[in-house]
Swiss-Prot record:
It holds the Pfam family Stealth_CR3. This is Exopolysaccharide phosphotransferase SCO6021. GO terms for molecular function: transferase activity, transferring phosphorus-containing groups. It comes from Streptomyces coelicolor (strain ATCC BAA-471 / A3(2) / M145). Belongs to the stealth family.
Amino acid sequence: MTTVSDFTAHQTATAVVARKGTAGPRPSAVDAPATLTDEHGDVYVEPGLTPLAAREANRSALVGLLDAAGVGHFAVRGTVDHGTVVGVAEEDRERALQAVFRGLGQYPGHLSVVDPDAPRPAKPVSSRDPRAWREVVGARILQVSWYRTDPGRHLLLGHEYGCALEFWRRQGTCLVAPRANRATWAVAVGGPNVMGAARLFSRFVSDWTPGHLAPALPTRPEFLVNCADDIAFPVDAVYTWVDGNDPAWKQRKAQAKGEVYHAESASDARFISRDELRYSIRSLHLFAPWIRNIYVVTDDQVPAWMREDLPGARIATHREIFRNPEDLPTFNSHSIESQLHHIEGLAEHFLYFNDDMFMGRPVAPHSFFTPNGTARYFPSRNRIPQGAVAETDSPVDAACKNNRALLHERFGKVITQPMEHIPYALRRSAMAEAELEFPEAWARTSASRFRAMTDLSPTSSFALYYAALTGRAQPGSMPFTYIQLAVPDLADRLQRLLDGRDQDSFCLNDAFSTPEDTEAQQELLDDFFTSYFPTPSPYER
């Protein structure tokens, strides 16, 4: 019978050997361990790091140790999306623990004993510390992880991305779980392992997530059920983007005819490219790997850094999506947004991003859609100004007032709030239906080459409220931050956002900026973007 003192002595000895470079199965293909601080302990440097990659590397490392020891195991549908869960029979406890000790001896990591009944989780402890092993022998659940960072030491992905080892107790013909999961309390003793789709084991994963980041896992048949809270439908992402420095685009803009009623409507600040799109797509790669396809809508422009030869992201030009070619060229985002539902191949459920919107941490599709497909919208605390459209209204307020008047005429309801600058969850069918139901207003918006007094705001308000009033959308909420780049304390706000990393999404919105302002802002943004989103997406050259 193995004792706590045996485990402690074993771990201390192997940790010393590991410091000398003993060969053995590594937790993943990473560089040599690098300690960020004494508090963090061993941290492994991994190029191309993402939360999903860290999650899979920890799972793969742990099950590799179990496989090497001949310990049978199965993936469990846990209730936490960041990490993974592996179940083993209680009778295999000693062999499983010895395998874990050997692995952590060769490549030190972190572990914690999980008590499902505790009011708060135990803090992870370095496997080099003998205290980490004191309660392991009788533990019902053990969480194991290897901390990871990117080569620039900007990301630190820790214990929450680890793999939990659950010991399932035999009771009659069943193995019984030590805690609740998403599917079942028990599986059959000696039951077969079957392959389960990766999305069953985390809501951060979809059927379109790359297999090397989220492979199918050996599990039990009891976990293959389609739960009521599963989202299996595809979700796409759509961006509108312009390179305001493109000479050809500048010439088209100079030749465009149309009445510009407000100085802000055609200001250069609206068309400045600060490379936000590159980093916004990085945010999807890092924090929303469940997105199926990314569409970038442009006026025959392609970002210089973007690859077009890979599936999963493509350019959709204005010429492809506009139903009335005479509306082109256009320099009005409202006009372009009115045609997004015409993108060929676009999913019924999609998120519309301005290129200044970003995911801030891992987010599940459930934040934007319910499992039955209902979209979520995010009303602002602000209010739409009273009265009819006036010449003094900003383009945003004028469009909100037009939305309000049209929806009130149709539904007898008065909308009072604009939307927060959070990615807009849209239903393609609702937009198509709105275009058919309000053809004159829709066509008028499409034909406005610059923002006009008569515009609707199709994606950021009108289509969301139309979906809500027809039973296809409901209010939601999420932690988010909105930063106006013109604020005097921009540097401090960006630093707080970077230090906290506690927002589901954020928006860095531009104002009417002078060239001097823009230059200073760009320097701050360059540092911020490379620190917050250090890992390139696959779509970068």
